[in-house]
Each structure stands twice: as structure tokens, then as C-alpha cells.
């Protein structure tokens, strides 16, 4: 029986990078006889233009029926002035929520070939391999009440709510500990328990879950200290588990330790490891249509999909090896280019990975 993968290119550079990722996926499908069937649909601004909403019901139904979803990126200035509840980003939040994709895995890995592209000294980041586990369907992005009200003095006041239940914290903590068990058996939980009630509960529940994982060394950091430590001594971290807002910020910060956010994939998983896979970067409307975007994060998202949703380790390893071989050849898109390397565009980078994968 074939496995269904839904392709959602999205907006901005999304269609360009997705074209290259699909080329790699189709080659892997053929080379390793994976039995995948690919279907395509729209999300975000493209869905607003077509359906009037950022995520159509029929698209959501296709996502529910699929075994995995591969996403490009959403959003752009074209849709910035429309009502907040129907902006492109709401489609992304809705599909995560409706599919129950509560666990977001964001690796921050520095390829040795890109040590000179990092914003930090090579001796600080060499060998960097961090996994950030971010809670994805709770917290301040989904909390109610939220809105804007007029105070008695006529001034407008905006407000949001940051709620977390015990069960939401417990399930993401388990993901963090499970990831730590198959890596370096070190887990750092990041919160703001000195200020926030939700973080106080977060820390309490993480401590409870830790009792089931005696082999894992657990530490806690306040988010402001964690942000500082990521720059000061990032290799002290192995797995970080944190909430939605903090994870959003810290994972982008960690991405720059690797040289470019254009290198970083992500996985968003439900309780059964059905997932949606996407690059960590956004839609980059400023470079959309120029053919210069880095497709490697999306290609590596394909590898994560094969690994986490389908347990196809050999095919996943092969894609990662192909990317590494291309970097060995000195091939670079502009965001990771340095003197003496070969600067290429989006399509050329995708073609290079396809060629490397074909020759493995």
C-alpha cells in the first residue's frame, strides 16, 4: 500500500525551494522503492488568493489523510494588511493545531564545511549539534482571551494569555527526554519560572517526568540566561526542551550559530509520529522569484520526514550524506558562500544534491 505525502509549497520562496526538495524526494522514492504518492495543494497566502482563507477545509482533510506533510513557507507583504485572523500565518497555526502536531524538533547542526559561515569563532561552534524540542500547539500563540480593548482613559491596550496544562507540559517533556535518551542523555529545560506562573508549573512537571528517565542529566535555565549561554558556550547543550514562544526565539538564535537558517530543517510530530516537515526559515519575500534561495533546509526536512515518520533510516542517511558531499565540493548558495567557494542558485544546488544522491 502506497504512502501519501501532501506537498504544500506556500508563499515567497516556498515554491522554489519545494521544487528542489521534491526532486530529491522523487529520486529517493525511486532509488529506494519507498512507495510514496505525492499530492500538491496550497496554504497561506496562496490559499487566500485561491480560496479566501489561509487553509481550506479540503486541504486540511488532505493533510489528515496523508501520512506526512511537506511544507515550504507562508506569508508575505501582500497579505500583511488583511484581517489578522485570516492572514497566511493563521493557516500554519491551524494545520499544526488540527493535526495535533504538538512536538517541534529543530536541530541546530554546524556542518564542518561551514565553520567559517558561523557568526561565532570556529573553536566555539566546531562540532555543534543541538536539538531544540519546542512545544507547538499551546502557550501564548493559542491562548485566550486575547485582543485589544479601550481603557477608561481612552487608551488602547492589547493583551495575550500564556496558558499551559499539566498534560501539555508532560507530553512535550517526554519527547525531550526521549530525544535525550538516543543522544547524549543531557536535557536542559528552559522556562521563566522566576516570573511566570505557567513556567512554574512547567518546571514542576518536567521534574516529575524526569523521575522516569534516571539516566538523563536534567538542568534548568531561565530563558534570558539560555539565550546568553547559546552565544557564550553553545556546545554545553545537547537537547533543549521549552515552550512555544521561547522555542520560537531560541531556535532562530541557534540557527545563526550554524551559519545560516537556510540550512536548518524541522519536524512537527503528533503522538504517533505523523508529522509535518518544513524549513526553519520563513518565506523570504525579499528574494522570492530570484532563484537564489537555499533549498538545503527543505531537502533536509525530507530526510527528517523519512527518519521520524517512516523509519526509513538508510534513505534519510543517504540524503544527509548527499548534502554533505555537495558542501565538500565547495558548492554554496549566497547565504553560506565564502571566498573560494562556488556560488550557485536554488536550482543548481538542488541539481547538485540530486546528482550526489544518485551516485551513492
From Swiss-Prot:
<dbReference type="GO" id="GO:0005829">
    <property type="term" value="C:cytosol"/>
</dbReference>
<dbReference type="GO" id="GO:0003862">
    <property type="term" value="F:3-isopropylmalate dehydrogenase activity"/>
</dbReference>
<feature type="site" description="Important for catalysis">
    <location>
        <position position="141"/>
    </location>
</feature>
<protein>
    <recommendedName>
        <fullName>3-isopropylmalate dehydrogenase</fullName>
        <ecNumber>1.1.1.85</ecNumber>
    </recommendedName>
</protein>
<comment type="similarity">
    <text>Belongs to the isocitrate and isopropylmalate dehydrogenases family. LeuB type 1 subfamily.</text>
</comment>
<dbReference type="GO" id="GO:0051287">
    <property type="term" value="F:NAD binding"/>
</dbReference>
<dbReference type="Pfam" id="PF00180">
    <property type="entry name" value="Iso_dh"/>
</dbReference>
<feature type="binding site">
    <location>
        <position position="248"/>
    </location>
    <ligand>
        <name>Mg(2+)</name>
    </ligand>
</feature>
<keyword id="KW-0464">Manganese</keyword>
<comment type="subunit">
    <text>Homodimer.</text>
</comment>
<feature type="binding site">
    <location>
        <position position="252"/>
    </location>
    <ligand>
        <name>Mg(2+)</name>
    </ligand>
</feature>
<comment type="function">
    <text>Catalyzes the oxidation of 3-carboxy-2-hydroxy-4-methylpentanoate (3-isopropylmalate) to 3-carboxy-4-methyl-2-oxopentanoate. The product decarboxylates to 4-methyl-2 oxopentanoate.</text>
</comment>
<keyword id="KW-0963">Cytoplasm</keyword>
<feature type="site" description="Important for catalysis">
    <location>
        <position position="192"/>
    </location>
</feature>
<feature type="binding site">
    <location>
        <position position="96"/>
    </location>
    <ligand>
        <name>substrate</name>
    </ligand>
</feature>
<dbReference type="InterPro" id="IPR024084">
    <property type="entry name" value="IsoPropMal-DH-like_dom"/>
</dbReference>
<dbReference type="InterPro" id="IPR004429">
    <property type="entry name" value="Isopropylmalate_DH"/>
</dbReference>
<keyword id="KW-0520">NAD</keyword>
<comment type="pathway">
    <text>Amino-acid biosynthesis; L-leucine biosynthesis; L-leucine from 3-methyl-2-oxobutanoate: step 3/4.</text>
</comment>
<keyword id="KW-0460">Magnesium</keyword>
<dbReference type="InterPro" id="IPR019818">
    <property type="entry name" value="IsoCit/isopropylmalate_DH_CS"/>
</dbReference>
<keyword id="KW-0432">Leucine biosynthesis</keyword>
<keyword id="KW-0028">Amino-acid biosynthesis</keyword>
<feature type="binding site">
    <location>
        <position position="224"/>
    </location>
    <ligand>
        <name>substrate</name>
    </ligand>
</feature>
<dbReference type="GO" id="GO:0000287">
    <property type="term" value="F:magnesium ion binding"/>
</dbReference>
<keyword id="KW-0560">Oxidoreductase</keyword>
<feature type="binding site">
    <location>
        <position position="224"/>
    </location>
    <ligand>
        <name>Mg(2+)</name>
    </ligand>
</feature>
<keyword id="KW-0100">Branched-chain amino acid biosynthesis</keyword>
<feature type="binding site">
    <location>
        <position position="134"/>
    </location>
    <ligand>
        <name>substrate</name>
    </ligand>
</feature>
<feature type="binding site">
    <location>
        <position position="106"/>
    </location>
    <ligand>
        <name>substrate</name>
    </ligand>
</feature>
<keyword id="KW-0479">Metal-binding</keyword>
<dbReference type="GO" id="GO:0009098">
    <property type="term" value="P:L-leucine biosynthetic process"/>
</dbReference>
<feature type="binding site">
    <location>
        <begin position="282"/>
        <end position="294"/>
    </location>
    <ligand>
        <name>NAD(+)</name>
    </ligand>
</feature>
<feature type="binding site">
    <location>
        <begin position="76"/>
        <end position="89"/>
    </location>
    <ligand>
        <name>NAD(+)</name>
    </ligand>
</feature>
